[in-house]
Regions:
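Ubiquitin-like/PB1-type beta-grasp interaction modules and other compact soluble beta-rich domains
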Residues: 1-69
Length: 70
């Protein structure tokens, strides 16, 4: 049975599934993983660690999306 946990994304309170990875979180948020950078608890989280890093209750994420243009 999966339980919900509370995390913060860009300063907002959100629910996440217990046992979800950061990559799962991005998919749930509908974000293109190729165009974002993630800070977890005040530290940059390298892209190769996204699939192995599990979200934990109380985690604070800042997710920045890159936008192209001219």
């Amino acid at each position: 049975m999966e339980t919900g946990i509370t995390i913060f994304v860009n300063g907002e309170n959100r629910s996440a599934k217990s046992g979800a990875s950061v990559a799962d979180l991005l998919r749930e948020l509908g974000l293109d993983s190729g165009r974002v950078a993630i800070e977890r608890n005040l530290e940059i989280l390298p892209r190769p660690q996204w699939a192995q890093t599990l979200v934990a209750s109380g985690d604070r994420y800042e997710i920045v999306q890159f936008v192209g243009g001219g």
